[in-house]
Regions:
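Short, helix-capping/interhelical loops that line the mouth of catalytic, cofactor-
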Residues: 1-6, 55-120
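Alpha-helical scaffold segments that form or flank carboxylate-/histidine-based iron centers
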Residues: 1-9, 30-51, 91-103, 130-148, ...
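Helix-loop segments that flank and shape redox-cofactor active sites
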Residues: 19-40, 61-65, 120-136
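A generic secondary-structure signal for well-formed alpha-helical elements
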Residues: 22, 48, 52-59, 63, ...
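A short mid-domain helix/strand-loop element embedded in enzyme catalytic domains
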Residues: 86-87, 111, 115-133, 144-160
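Acidic, aliphatic-rich amphipathic alpha-helical segments
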Residues: 123, 139-215, 279-284
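Glycine/small-residue-rich hydrophobic helix-like segments
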Residues: 197-243
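C-terminal interaction segments
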Residues: 231-284
Length: 284
């Protein structure tokens, strides 16, 4: 596993490269539809501005020992995208409209402030709990949360503009840490959208070999799920893929059916059950 310092440096490099990408983005591309249903490319950037401000505030408070929810926010662990997706979509559009021509400049300023804050955390500060609606999170793991966010939203933008877009391989270890440790908006709980209770649970097994290995079962009961590392029971469906496909599936960027049809996801077991996986794991 990479150290905090190594992950922090990778996050910083990726964030700065993403800033450069936006500096060179033609004006016409800012008004294109992104992979996020309700957002233009510029709306995605406005969302990143808002999260920069939130992360900076919650980490600054957390390292001072203040971890209570800000006014208007749910208790840590009580928030979920199903409760806030519509409001989030509208607020990001409103922020983009308000920022106007200063959107890029504001994004870079807020992003750089957050980069300096997160990469400058001391070893003691990294362990201090900080508020997030998804869960309490050690300050140091906000590096992983922001890294994941930057890379996924980069995919949301680039996949809508370029013929081939993928996830940065440098980010995959941070994403796996978030999933396995169940941290806030990087967790499977955040990605899972509850449905009707199933009479019989479905056991999905992931066998991910590279570049970051993951072997785990996700047992879906319709209205809830559980994550079982290294489970030994027989699976209903076994998925085999690279880590970037695993991440895109978990965070709802591609469906299981699409990944199967494009040859990115190998399946053992019931094809119908395999394709149903994405009705539960939608991300935001």
């Amino acid at each position: 596993m990479l150290s905090f310092e190594e992950r922090a440096q990778l996050y910083k490099s990726e964030s700065q490269a993403f800033q450069d990408y936006h500096k060179n983005l033609p004006n016409t591309d800012w008004n294109k539809q992104s992979a996020c249903d309700e957002w233009l490319v510029s709306d995605v950037v406005a969302h990143l501005v808002g999260n920069s401000e939130f992360y900076s505030g919650t980490v600054s408070r957390g390292i001072r020992g203040e971890s209570s929810p800000p006014e208007g926010r749910p208790e840590a662990g009580k928030g979920h995208p199903s409760m806030s997706a519509d409001a989030l979509a509208k607020s990001s559009i409103a922020a983009r409209e308000k920022l106007g021509d200063s959107l890029l400049e504001t994004y870079i300023d807020k992003d750089n402030y957050l980069i300096d804050l997160l990469t400058g955390l001391t070893s003691e500060e990294r362990a201090r709990p900080c508020y997030h609606p998804g869960s309490m999170v050690p300050a140091g793991n906000f590096v992983d949360l922001r890294f994941k966010e930057i890379v996924l939203h980069q995919w949301d933008i680039r996949s809508a503009i370029e013929e081939k877009a993928g996830l940065s391989s440098a980010s995959l270890e941070s994403m796996v840490i978030l999933i396995e440790e169940s941290f806030a908006s990087g967790s499977l709980r955040w990605a899972f959208w509850s449905g009707t209770h199933l009479d019989k649970p479905v056991r999905y097994r992931f066998e991910v070999k590279s570049p970051v290995p993951v072997t785990a079962d996700i047992v879906v009961e319709g209205d809830k799920f559980r994550y079982e590392p290294d489970a030994q029971r027989a699976a209903d469906v076994t998925f085999r893929c690279h880590t970037h496909i695993f991440a895109l599936l978990m965070y709802g960027r591609i469906s299981a059916g699409q990944a199967i049809s494009e040859g990115h996801l190998a399946v053992d077991g019931d094809r119908g059950l395999a394709e149903q996986f994405s009705q539960w794991f939608k991300g935001i």
